[in-house]
């Protein structure tokens, strides 16, 4: 088997993979309307009922017991939202039901040129619906009332985490039929005080509190009526079918946008919107979590550990997609008090914090089928960054370490290529001698390989072994929120998007051309022409790929050129002295 043909097959496989990713960019997901891109937390929701956007989607008593479909009941929406602000979150709570209807991530600007505009995670405007709902349903649950969801009252209309304050508590109160309810939100300081402003700006994981993006939600039920109160806690995430704003602004490749749940059989089960279009998902689980995923960010409800919950996904009558759960029945005797709680995570996909919150939640950082290789690569990259403080230089350092790890394999590949280059005149002579008799030509080639002690697969197999590492690193750079808006130097201000001036892809094409010059020339003229086109083809596709990935490829090629040049010259020198 001709070594160049093997390399060509590998190269074409890579190009085919990149073609699929590029196709996803162009056809995988529609653009998000511009009007939904911004979030204004100072503007309340419409003060009139709207069947298209104000359905409560509250599980009924029947659904909490048996998992049947929730009711879609239009309710009035209050015109005054409760504003809450910490050092990492800027959000709004609707007193009608106590849902979080708007949420911006202060440490993650939507665009680099607008650092004062936070990325909008939750929104309930005209163009986009995405919110976190929770409440009490069941026999006596106030959210199951035919009059609509409860209208809570708060002591203030706005709350802000003060300097030196590590926790902010927001209480919403409601009373009905002798039962007093308090819906309590607990927010936490996100950034550690002992970190410098520079370290905070670099978003070092060591400077982010593990509960920075966790919101504690608890219900205090004080039953002062003359009978036993009965109900169920529910929580759900509701989102419309709009595109992912983080994906359309960050990179040209479409990533997963949809729901995911934890089940006993699968610690990370994805349920896409297409799945919800076809059928509902229902399963009884103990503990676990339900989540909605998008590029770089995730929202998840995490119930109390050890309790049995009914997990479900479905599509409501307004075309919104819902993933959530209903808890076990709570009974509060007359004159008694009960508290039940859960946790909402709304923020970036920080693997360490997600894993600590609930097992399997870190898998929402979806590295694909090579996750078992990608996770150690990210772990190493993150530790390098903790020392260097720049993700670009960290990628370069990681590339050097990976190259050192594969040095023996690469050396074997380059030695095989060098030997092939040395015997290329003999290979050309065999081709001319046997002409169109391919069987005799193949036999003569195999005899030549045996005589010269050349393994025709020696240059291809090491490359194949390294391909999973390359693909894993691709997903690490694509999926890790740490790369989002991370600068390197000069013109590279965001490693997660394409090079704005295409300098790195052009340099990469140049390094591939140099590598090609060091390789033996294919005996087949047509094959030689195709190989000459490979640097151009790769350069074209890499024009739109994340600068961080292209940086890795450029550095890897430069190291490969140096290694290949050294080995080739060494073998040629030995051949001359022999």
UniProtKB/Swiss-Prot annotation:
Pfam families: 60KD_IMP, YidC_periplas. Residues 34-72 are annotated as: Disordered. GO terms for biological process: protein insertion into membrane; protein transport. Residues 37-66 have a biased composition (Polar residues). CDD domains: 5TM_YidC_Alb3, EcYidC-like_peri. InterPro entries: Membr_insert_YidC, Membr_insert_YidC_N, YidC/ALB3/OXA1/COX18, YidC/Oxa/ALB_C, YidC_ALB_C, YidC_periplasmic_sf. Keywords: Cell inner membrane, Cell membrane, Chaperone, Membrane, Protein transport, Transmembrane, Transmembrane helix, Transport. The chain crosses the membrane at residues 3-23, 361-381, 387-407, 457-477, 500-520, 535-555. It is a multi-pass membrane protein. Interacts with the Sec translocase complex via SecD. Specifically interacts with transmembrane segments of nascent integral membrane proteins during membrane integration. PANTHER family: CYTOCHROME C OXIDASE ASSEMBLY PROTEIN COX18, MITOCHONDRIAL, OXA1. Required for the insertion and/or proper folding and/or complex formation of integral membrane proteins into the membrane. Involved in integration of membrane proteins that insert both dependently and independently of the Sec translocase complex, as well as at least some lipoproteins. Aids folding of multispanning membrane proteins. Belongs to the OXA1/ALB3/YidC family. Type 1 subfamily. This is Membrane protein insertase YidC. The gene is yidC.
């Amino acid at each position: 088997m001709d070594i160049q043909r093997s390399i060509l097959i590998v190269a074409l496989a890579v190009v085919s993979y990149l073609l699929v990713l590029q196709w996803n960019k162009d056809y995988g997901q529609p653009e998000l309307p511009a009007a939904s891109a911004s979030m204004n937390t100072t503007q309340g929701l419409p003060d009139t009922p709207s069947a298209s956007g104000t359905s409560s989607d509250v599980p009924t008593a029947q659904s909490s017991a048996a998992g049947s479909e929730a009711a879609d009941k239009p309710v009035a929406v209050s015109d005054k939202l409760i504003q809450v602000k910490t050092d990492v979150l800027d959000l709004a709570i609707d007193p009608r039901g106590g849902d979080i209807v708007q949420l911006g991530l202060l440490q993650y600007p939507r665009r680099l040129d607008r650092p004062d505009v936070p990325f909008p995670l939750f929104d309930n405007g005209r163009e986009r619906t995405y919110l976190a709902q929770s409440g009490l349903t069941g026999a006596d649950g106030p959210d199951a009332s035919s009059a609509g969801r409860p209208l809570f009252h708060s002591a203030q209309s706005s709350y802000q985490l003060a300097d030196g304050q590590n926790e902010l508590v927001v209480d919403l109160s409601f009373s009905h039929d002798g039962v007093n309810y308090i819906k309590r939100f607990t927010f936490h300081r996100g950034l550690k005080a002992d970190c410098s402003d520079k370290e905070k700006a670099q978003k070092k994981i060591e400077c982010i509190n593990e509960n920075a993006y966790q919101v504690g939600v608890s219900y205090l039920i004080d039953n002062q009526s003359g009978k036993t109160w009965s109900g169920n806690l529910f929580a759900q995430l509701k989102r419309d079918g709009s595109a992912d704003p983080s994906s359309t602004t960050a990179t040209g490749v479409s990533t997963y946008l949809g729901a995911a749940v934890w089940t006993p059989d699968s610690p990370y089960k994805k349920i896409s919107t297409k799945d919800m279009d076809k059928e509902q998902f229902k399963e009884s689980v103990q503990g676990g979590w339900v989540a909605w995923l998008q590029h770089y960010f995730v929202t998840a409800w995490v119930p109390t550990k050890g309790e049995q919950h009914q997990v479900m996904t479905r599509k409501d009558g307004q075309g919104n997609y819902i993933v959530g759960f209903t808890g076990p029945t709570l009974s509060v005797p007359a004159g008694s008090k009960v508290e039940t709680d859960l946790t909402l995570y709304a923020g970036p996909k920080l693997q360490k914090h997600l894993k600590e919150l609930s097992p399997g939640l870190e898998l929402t950082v979806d590295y694909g089928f090579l996750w078992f290789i990608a996770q150690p690569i990210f772990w190493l990259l993150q530790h390098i960054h903790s020392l260097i403080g720049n993700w670009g230089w960290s990628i370069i350092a990681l590339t050097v370490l990976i190259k050192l790890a594969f040095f023996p394999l690469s050396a074997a590949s380059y030695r095989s290529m060098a030997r092939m280059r040395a015997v290329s005149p003999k290979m050309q002579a065999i081709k001319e001698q046997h002409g169109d008799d391919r069987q005799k030509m193949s036999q003569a080639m195999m005899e030549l390989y045996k005589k010269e002690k050349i393994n025709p697969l020696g240059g291809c197999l090491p490359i194949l072994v390294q391909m999973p590492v390359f693909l894993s690193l691709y997903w690490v750079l694509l999926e890790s929120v740490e790369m989002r808006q991370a600068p390197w130097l000069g013109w590279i201000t965001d490693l997660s998007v394409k090079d704005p001036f295409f300098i790195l892809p052009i340099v990469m094409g140049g390094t591939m051309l140099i590598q090609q010059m060091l390789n033996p020339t294919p005996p087949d003229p047509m094959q030689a022409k195709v190989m000459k086109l490979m640097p151009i083809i790769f350069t074209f596709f890499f024009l739109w790929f994340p600068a961080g990935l292209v940086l890795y490829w450029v550095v890897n090629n430069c190291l490969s050129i140096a290694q290949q040049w050294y080995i080739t010259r060494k073998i040629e020198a030995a051949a001359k002295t022999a």
